[in-house]
């Protein structure tokens, strides 16, 4: 298949504009959608792709194709997010602007349609944009032809409202959890909030809040992805907080209190993640909205606590602004009127906290239920308080901060009446004017009902302390409130029943006698006191009720306590020793405490150190566990990503296979249809209506075609044969008849041909004469122009020749100038190269001279080193000679001792003493090791150095004079023939006798040619030098050697050869 023709974005854009120009917007949208979602688009430049996307979103908005827009924008985000984020924002802003513009136009159109009707609400009454048409509306539209405003809006405005809502949701889904698109994400969320507020879209607002909440939860889940947002970043967290505060404001404006409370929880969660404190202006808005939520939910206890926190924040902001520690932008603007209003509401909300619960749907133990405790803990955390609030704590805090002075006078009087000087018989008369003032204020009117509950509670609590029974009529007269806030007897009875159900009141109502009887059972247990109720009641402790006198039950219950106190006081006055014993015990306890204070302090310090170590160990363990968890999480995330990537690849591979298979099937079906059409049009007599394409293939179709062609061929041949037979007989008859008329026809044809020839000839001659005349006339007419043409051509030639000469001379001048410039450049370059060569030559000579000096210095240093080595070597040789002499004397002594032992064993006479022994030559060194010779036969540097020293040294020293005792024995060894000995194989690294070493003669058994004594060791360089000298200069063997050898036994070896001791012992 050929490639698609529109690959470049410019071509696609041009093609789409052409389709739009001819009114084919859906086709243009399809072209743009295919190009945007194509894989080839990923390599396209962003600059050329942006106009395509702008036109794409414009067409999607015009045609209300939200799904196509979502697909294209997702693909465009994946392409451009790594290169250019700004273009994504431009396209998405354009998308939102176009959708908002369509909604505005739809509203204007609806107003136009309903201009004759009464003005109605600006928005439709459709509750859910995703469920516009209900069965009721369809039935109503069917049976009624009336055109109302709601129906007009539903038909005109609501579809565009739905599309705008889908636009916001699509953009938020595209921008979610992307740090590079975070600002655009927050801006879009704020625009969506304004959309819900402007058109009162409560259902869409709930969905929007849930959508944003899911995005934040997924941000922590997919934090390892590329470009994921980091909630630890202060700027990111601040943007999310701003969005949630706007969400809270819109929820309060729409009176969606459940969503407002969830928004409060979202804000509290984000604040707990923030590392820097929130701004005071934000927290003021937070506490104000929280107070409104608690008031709507009738949780008066936490409502009063929220007002308390709000007042504290206002006071802190005022102090910070007065001290210059903060800016007006970060702190709410506070005036004296604001502080008075806040103080009044704090006090009024605290007074409105019910003492008992007003809910009838709760059992007696509801307030101690675990769910209630968890809820109170959650609300306490939302307020940022360490412990749950109570009525007494709130009043104490208000008094400590001086709220009575700041509050309005009527609120201050109300506090004094209810909490300080409560009188049940005159309470209603005193409170009536205050309730009227509170009821006149719309904001404070909401507190009248809870105040009535508090007043009734106080009334019955104090009546139960004074009376045992009272008439119902008397109670109704006491509970009289001003006109708008009257309470009926039924409401009073309802209140009594609720208090009895909760255990806060013990009252029996007798309607027959019209009497209220208070419980006076002195043995009854204490009433259950519960903290906090569903309506936000306070903790009903005993101290919160003014005590007029003790009830009989309390007197019976506290009898033992009073007796113990009385006996204690009596003992103190009657028995002085009791008091002294108490004082002594106290002193002893103080002494013990002082004695153990130091030890306890040390133990405390040691315990503190141990605790710190445990904390560090726990912290290290926690950090290690967190690192391991992060590692496992990262590995798990990588595995999930790889699995997801593999799954996507498999799905893509399957989709590609399915697409190829579908494409092949489609092409096959098209080919089959095409062949069938060709078969139908080309071959007659075939009915293709009964052919099933599913069971048909190309071979079967070809067989059908061939069979039909064969059939047609046979029929055609039969018709041709029949026709030929018929024509053959007919033609034969015609020719027989023609033979009679052929001569006549020939003569007539010949005559017609001659006439036609003559006419054509005359016409040709006439035309030739006319053409000749016209040519001659043209020649005479043009011949007048030849001189003018020649002169004009000559002038043009001369002008062009002059111009050519001018250009040639200019070119020659330019050539000469460039030639001179080139020569100058070449000369300059050659001078520069010559200077460089001379400088290089100078540097080379200097380098050579420096190298020569260094070489001379090195040679001098080498000569000096060799001289020092030679001196050291000479010293070592002298030391070695001295050691050899000592070793030789030791050896002579050993030999003498060995000879004596041998003589004693053999029974011979004593061997010659040491005095008769000839002196050994002094020139002998340590035995040489049988080291491996150098490869190649070349002497080492030590050998060469020794040869040089031997050449320039003095002649060999004179031989040691022989003793006079044996002068005649000298020639005897020379005359004797040397004995042959078998040379033992040499072991590498072992000891080798001197006569077998490398310095000896070629024959190992023969004595040296120069004649020195075999026992005398001569260095190698001396042996080499002595071998080249004449025999006259060699040393003669000393005579005592021969004499000594003659004295030896016959079995001993020749005197010229040294025999080891172990061999001598064997012999």
UniProtKB/Swiss-Prot annotation:
Residues 617-632, 642-665, 795-901, 916-926 have a biased composition (Basic and acidic residues). Residues 92-121, 608-899 form a coiled coil. Residues 617-665, 795-1067 are annotated as: Disordered. One of its GO terms (biological process) is translation reinitiation. One of its GO terms (molecular function) is translation initiation factor activity. Residues 965-976, 1025-1046 have a biased composition (Low complexity). GO terms for cellular component: cytoplasmic stress granule; eukaryotic 43S preinitiation complex; eukaryotic 48S preinitiation complex; eukaryotic translation initiation factor 3 complex, eIF3e; eukaryotic translation initiation factor 3 complex, eIF3m; multi-eIF complex. Keywords: Coiled coil, Cytoplasm, Initiation factor, Protein biosynthesis, RNA-binding. PROSITE patterns: PCI. Residues 339-523 form the PCI domain. It is found in: Cytoplasm. Component of the eukaryotic translation initiation factor 3 (eIF-3) complex. RNA-binding component of the eukaryotic translation initiation factor 3 (eIF-3) complex, which is involved in protein synthesis of a specialized repertoire of mRNAs and, together with other initiation factors, stimulates binding of mRNA and methionyl-tRNAi to the 40S ribosome. The eIF-3 complex specifically targets and initiates translation of a subset of mRNAs involved in cell proliferation. Belongs to the eIF-3 subunit A family. This is Eukaryotic translation initiation factor 3 subunit A. It comes from Neosartorya fischeri (strain ATCC 1020 / DSM 3700 / CBS 544.65 / FGSC A1164 / JCM 1740 / NRRL 181 / WB 181). The gene is tif32.
């Amino acid at each position: 298949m050929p490639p698609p023709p529109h690959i470049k974005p410019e071509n696609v854009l041009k093609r789409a504009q052409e389709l739009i120009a001819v009114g084919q917007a859906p086709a243009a949208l399809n072209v743009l959608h295919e190009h945007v979602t194509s894989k080839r688009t990923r390599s396209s430049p962003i600059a050329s792709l942006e106009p395509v996307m702008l036109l794409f979103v414009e067409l999607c908005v015009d045609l209300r194709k939200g799904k196509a827009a979502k697909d294209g924008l997702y693909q465009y985000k994946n392409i451009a997010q790594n290169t250019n984020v700004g273009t994504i924002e431009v396209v998405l802003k354009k998308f939102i602007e176009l959708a908002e513009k369509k909604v505005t136009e739809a509203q204007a159109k609806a107003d136009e349609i309903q201009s004759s009707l009464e003005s109605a609400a600006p928005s439709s009454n459709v509750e859910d944009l995703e469920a516009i048409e209900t069965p009721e509306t369809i039935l109503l539209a069917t049976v009624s032809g009336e055109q109302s405003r709601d129906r007009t809006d539903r038909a005109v405005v609501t579809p565009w409202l739905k599309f705008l809502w889908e636009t916001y949701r699509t953009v938020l889904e595209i921008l979610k959890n992307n740090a590079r698109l975070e600002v655009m994400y927050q801006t879009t969320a704020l625009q969506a909030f304004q959309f819900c507020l402007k058109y009162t879209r409560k259902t869409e607002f709930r969905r929007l809040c849930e959508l944003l909440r899911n995005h934040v939860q997924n941000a922590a889940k997919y934090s390892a992805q590329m470009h994921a947002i980091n909630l630890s970043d202060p700027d990111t967290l601040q943007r999310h907080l701003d969005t949630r505060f706007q969400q809270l404001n819109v929820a309060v404006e729409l009176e969606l209190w459940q969503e407002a409370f969830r928004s409060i929880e979202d804000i509290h969660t984000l604040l707990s993640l923030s590392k820097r404190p929130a701004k005071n202006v934000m927290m003021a808005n937070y506490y104000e909205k929280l107070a409104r939520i608690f008031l709507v939910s009738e949780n008066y206890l936490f409502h009063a606590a929220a007002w308390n926190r709000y007042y504290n924040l206002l006071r802190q902001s005022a102090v910070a602004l007065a001290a210059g520690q903060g800016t007006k932008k970060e702190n709410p603007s506070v005036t004296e009127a604001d502080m008075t209003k806040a103080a009044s509401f704090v006090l009024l909300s605290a007074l409105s906290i019910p003492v008992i619960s007003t809910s009838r749907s709760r059992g007696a133990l509801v307030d101690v239920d675990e769910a209630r405790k968890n809820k109170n803990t959650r609300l306490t955390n939302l307020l940022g308080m360490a412990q749950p609030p109570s009525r007494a704590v709130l009043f104490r805090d208000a008094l400590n901060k001086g709220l009575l002075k700041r509050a309005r006078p009527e609120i201050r009087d109300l506090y004094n009446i209810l909490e300080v000087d409560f009188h049940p018989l005159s309470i209603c008369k005193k409170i009536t004017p205050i309730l009227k003032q509170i009821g006149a204020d719309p904001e404070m009117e909401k507190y009248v009902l809870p105040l009535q509950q508090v007043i009734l509670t106080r009334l019955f609590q104090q009546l139960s302390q004074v009376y045992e029974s009272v008439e119902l009529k008397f109670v109704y007269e006491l509970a009289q409130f001003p006109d708008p806030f009257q309470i009926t007897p039924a409401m009073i009875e309802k209140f009594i029943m609720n208090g009895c159900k909760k255990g806060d009141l013990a009252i029996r109502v007798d309607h027959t006698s019209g009497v209220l009887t208070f419980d006076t059972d002195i043995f009854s247990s204490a009433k259950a006191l519960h903290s906090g109720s569903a309506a936000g009641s306070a903790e009903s402790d005993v101290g919160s009720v003014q005590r007029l006198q003790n009830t009989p039950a309390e007197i019976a219950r506290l009898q033992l306590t009073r007796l113990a106190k009385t006996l204690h006081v009596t003992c103190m006055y009657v028995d002085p020793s009791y008091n002294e014993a108490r004082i002594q015990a106290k002193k002893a306890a103080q002494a013990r405490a002082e004695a153990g204070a130091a030890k306890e302090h040390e133990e405390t310090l040691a315990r503190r150190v141990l605790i710190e170590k445990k904390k560090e160990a726990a912290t290290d363990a926690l950090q290690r566990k967190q690192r391991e968890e992060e590692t496992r999480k990262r590995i798990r995330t990588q595995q999930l990503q790889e699995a997801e990537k593999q799954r996507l690849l498999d799905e893509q591979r399957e989709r590609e296979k399915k697409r190829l298979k579908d494409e092949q099937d489609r092409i096959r079906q098209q080919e089959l249809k095409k062949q069938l059409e060709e078969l139908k049009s080309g071959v007659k007599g075939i009915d293709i209506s009964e052919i099933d394409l599913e069971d048909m293939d190309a071979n079967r179709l070809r067989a059908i075609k061939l069979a039909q062609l064969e059939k047609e061929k046979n029929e055609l041949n039969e018709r041709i044969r029949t026709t030929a037979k018929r024509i053959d007989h007919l033609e034969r008859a015609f020719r027989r008849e023609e033979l009679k008329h052929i001569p006549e026809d020939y003569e007539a044809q010949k005559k017609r041909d001659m006439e036609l020839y003559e006419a054509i000839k005359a016409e040709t001659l006439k035309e030739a004469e006319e053409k000749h005349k016209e040519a001659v006339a043209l020649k005479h007419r043009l011949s007048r122009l030849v001189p003018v043409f020649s002169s004009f051509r000559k002038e043009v030639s001369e002008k062009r020749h002059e111009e050519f000469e001018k250009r040639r001379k200019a070119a020659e001048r330019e050539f000469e100038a460039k030639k001179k410039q080139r020569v100058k450049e070449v000369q300059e370059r050659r001078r520069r190269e010559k200077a460089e060569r001379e400088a290089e030559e100078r540097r080379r000579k200097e380098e050579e001279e420096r190298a020569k000096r260094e070489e001379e210095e090195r040679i001098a240093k080498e000569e000096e080193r060799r001289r020092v080595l030679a001196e050291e070597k000479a010293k070592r040789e002298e030391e070695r000679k001295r050691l050899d002499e000592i070793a030789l004397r030791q050896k002579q002594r050993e030999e003498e001792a060995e000879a004596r032992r041998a003589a004693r064993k053999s029974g011979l006479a004593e061997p010659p003493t040491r005095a008769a022994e000839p002196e050994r030559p002094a020139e002998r060194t340590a035995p040489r090791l049988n080291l491996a010779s150098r490869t190649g036969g070349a002497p080492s540097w030590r050998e060469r150095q020794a040869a040089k020293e031997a050449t320039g040294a003095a002649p060999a020293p004179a031989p040691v004079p022989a003793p006079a005792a044996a002068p005649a024995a000298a020639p005897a060894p020379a005359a004797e023939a040397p004995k042959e000995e078998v040379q033992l194989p040499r072991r590498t690294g072992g000891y080798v006798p001197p006569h077998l070493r490398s310095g000896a003669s070629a024959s190992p058994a023969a004595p040296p040619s120069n004649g020195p004594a075999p026992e005398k060791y001569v260095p190698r360089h001396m042996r080499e030098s002595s071998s080249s000298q004449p025999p006259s200069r060699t040393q003669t063997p000393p005579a005592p050697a021969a004499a000594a050898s003659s004295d030896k036994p016959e079995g001993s070896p020749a005197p010229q050869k040294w025999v080891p001791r172990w061999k001598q012992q064997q012999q």
